[in-house]
Amino acid sequence: MINLRAALVVGVVSLLWATTTLTLGQLVGVTLLLYIVTGGYYTVWLAYNTLPRDLRAGVRYLRVLAKVKWATYSNSNIPRMFMENVRKNPNKVALIFEDQKWTFAQIDEYSNRVANLMVSDGYKHGDTVALFMMNQPEYVCTWLGCAKVGVVTALINFNLRHAPLIHCVQVAESKAIICGRELQDALKEAKDELKLPVYVSGCGNTAPEVKDAKNMDQLLSTSDPTPPLELDKVGSFDKMLYIFTSGTTGLPKAAIIKHARYLFFCTGAHHMAALTEEDIIYNPLPLYHSAGGMVGMGQVLVFNCTAVIRRKFSASQFWIEAGKHNCTVGQYVGELCRYLLNTPPKPEDTQHKVKVMFGNGVRAQIWEQFTSRFNMPTIAEFYGATEGIANIMNMDGKPGACGFVPVILRHVIPVYLIKVDEETGEPMRDKNGFCIMCEPGEPGEFVGMIKRNDPLRDFHGYADRKATQKKIVQDVWKKGDAAFKSGDILVMDEFGYLYFKDRTGDTFRWRGENVSSTEVEGVVSKVAGNKDAVVYGVEVPGAEGKAGMAAIVDPDDSTNLTELLVELKKNLPTYACPLFLRILKTIDATGTFKLKKLALQKEGFDRNLIKDALYFLDGKQNKYVELTPELFARISDGKAGL
């Protein structure tokens, strides 16, 4: 309706401009009058509330566009951009790690040695090596050196063992493995099956523990420290990295990261979060993941910032170290912000210079609590999958929002919410066979339109071609077009702000209503004292849909179930209150702090299988009661009155 009205007004005003002698002021008056007469006051009201935001975003987006387009036009690459920073500031500190400070020049020299070692050992442009190493400066130097000669690096999660580790190395078609000294035991368990050359980093003059492995430190000491000749052969659309998905629902998938893709990710974060090269970034995230390795490290490599990294995230040390190193920016992902809230209050909570936290995954339920406690002016929440092209950012700190899109010039940013079937998760189609766009307030799957050979909109997919095809929906708005399916359900308000609602497949139906597991998780976690909690639907014999089940990590068994139920009923509709509770000692999480619930979901509420404490919401008694074998049998036989 808005677009039709706008077209009508533009048409009439254009006709008047061409056929009359009205002044510019008169034309403006006619335009406003026409718009109001045709019901455009709502659009004027929307414009008043959103145009300042959209104009600021537009200016920043143009900077992103200019940077990425120029780089691809000149066929540049990430190492070359880094080397330009080396030329300008060779002695500036790039990385701080424990008691070490690495300058741009030191990173450049180390990465040159890696690059020339790869060439001398016979690895060529397009080959892949797997990097299995803990967070440390050598990690970044190693993949940067490989990138200088066109060797692709598969960044392997250092928490993986056995089959998942073997899978990741093999799916990337790795020709060698570079392993950190601390991870040799894990690699020894898989080496016989992998049968690949191994380089071990960090051994110094000590022989590696892995049989037949090469001592990388010794090899680098004699490698050429000058820039490799092969650097000029590396282009913007060459593969640079494989970064693996978190693997919350199965084995990780290897997402293809090209130089242009890496640049877009870090450039988008830099400009939309209004960072500068003077910023010092506290980055405690795993460097094998896109948040830490692309968004975070990209600020160093491309934008000349300084970053503080650590071997593993520590909630107790976060603000202490951020203050110690005068950090101005902090990074988060997943449940990290909640972990920080769970630490005992201390003076360092506010004795820091961090002006903005940027990342993705902070829950709406703790947003304002976090900003208040840690004196945080801005949370720059962004949304975007490692491999995806549906990317947005909340640049003005709207609580709970993961980003926004313009509402007046809606199609400037080619990302949309489309309606999906609640049962199958497949896109719904209109009578012409095309997708249906959601209205404000309607949940839908977030998609981004694909444009081939465009650095901002091309979907490069995964190493597995079948997995790539599953993420593409065809014939979205017209015959032949295509979009990337995020797999996430979002909802948009009237001002264009988008809010994460759930993963497709995580929403379940109970008592004729849709229940968002993500929304219920946020409430359960908060009322349980910010404990780890996951929510999922379980099948109940004789009942339609799936009943909600919440699993709460409470090793001390300190949760008061009576108080919990009171708070749940205050904050949730009746149908969304979990019917079952499971009290856990611990729960598995990914390296990016996403809680795993697939195994729990498969176990359901089976009292004979589960050894943890289980409870059932008895409607007659209005309380959670222990799920005894007898009660389990009654529910399973359909005799519990559900």
Per-range role (PLM):
Residues 3, 7, 14-32, 100-101, ...:
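Conserved AMP-binding/adenylate-forming
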Residues 17-27, 39, 60, 99, ...:
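ANL superfamily adenylate-forming
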Residues 70-79, 83, 91-136, 140-144, ...:
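Conserved AMP-binding/adenylate-forming core of the ANL superfamily
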Residues 90-93, 203-205, 221-244, 251, ...:
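Conserved pre-ATP/AMP-binding loop-to-beta segment of ANL
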Residues 160, 166-167, 177-179, 330, ...:
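AMP-binding/adenylate-forming catalytic core of the ANL superfamily
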Residues 263-280, 288-328, 343:
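Conserved AMP-binding/adenylation subdomain of ANL enzymes
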Residues 302, 324-333, 341-424, 458, ...:
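Gly/Ser/Thr-rich phosphate-binding loop
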Residues 570-595, 612-637:
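AMP-binding/adenylate-forming catalytic domain of the ANL superfamily
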